[in-house]
């Protein structure tokens, strides 16, 4: 376990900081939407924008990783996430916020793909479970810490948005300075939804229902 952490500390440190920012901004936007008196339809639309970007990023980013590599993709989309949160502070209206949430979703799913593919490349059959369990533990702890930051901020002001941007930008530092080589990209293999359903109907339906529940809870 300690050897795994030693070999992946830069990756996990940057990801932990990023998850703090992620947890903070998700709750911040919900509270600020109430303060700005956005109607329920507008709030639902802007929070759903995250998952629109998430879906779009999941289908396009693997090709981009193949062209420019894991580290550049992580850096580029952490920067985009840092930029998109500032849109919320500058343009306080549902349309601008929806656009910003699409950018955020696209950026974060890109980072998730980089993380998970990088970890799977480093893992063996013996260590894969340990690596992925650490990854999920850091994800949840980071989001929890980010949520707590809401208690020490004033959501009606612009400073919390700047703090999120600072966290997202600082997440780049350990990744860009790591001595570890990024994984070599392998040829992509694709499976469509029909193929996935034929392979495992129950798992496909379960993932769909889990996604519905997760997106609803995350957007509250």
Across the structure, where does each feature detected by a protein language model lie?
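Helix-loop boundary and gating motifs at the non-cytosolic
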Residues: 2-51, 207, 214-220
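Paired small-residue
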Residues: 95-103
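Cytoplasmic helix-loop-helix junction between adjacent transmembrane helices
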Residues: 102-137
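Symmetry-related core transmembrane helices of the 12-TM Major Facilitator Superfamily/SLC fold
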Residues: 160-176
């Amino acid at each position: 376990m300690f050897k795994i952490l030693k070999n992946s500390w830069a990756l996990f440190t940057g990801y932990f900081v990023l998850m703090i920012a992620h947890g903070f901004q998700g709750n911040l936007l919900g509270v600020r939407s109430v303060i700005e008196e956005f109607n329920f339809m507008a709030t639902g639309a802007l929070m759903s924008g995250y998952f629109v970007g998430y879906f779009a990023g999941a289908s396009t980013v693997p090709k981009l990783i193949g062209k420019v590599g894991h580290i550049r993709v992580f850096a580029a989309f952490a920067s985009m996430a840092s930029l998109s949160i500032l849109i919320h502070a500058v343009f306080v209206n549902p349309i601008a916020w929806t656009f910003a949430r699409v950018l955020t979703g696209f950026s974060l799913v890109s980072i998730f793909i980089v993380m998970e593919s990088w970890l799977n490349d480093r893992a063996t059959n013996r260590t894969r479970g340990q690596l992925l369990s650490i990854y999920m533990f850091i994800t949840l702890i980071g989001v929890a810490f980010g949520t707590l930051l809401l208690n020490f901020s004033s959501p009606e002001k612009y400073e919390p948005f700047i703090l999120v941007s600072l966290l997202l930008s600082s997440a780049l530092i350990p990744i860009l300075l790591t001595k570890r080589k990024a994984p070599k990209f392998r040829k992509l293999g694709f499976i469509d939804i029909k193929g996935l359903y034929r392979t495992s109907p129950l798992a496909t339906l379960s993932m769909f229902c889990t996604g519905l529940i997760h997106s609803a809870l995350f957007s509250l």
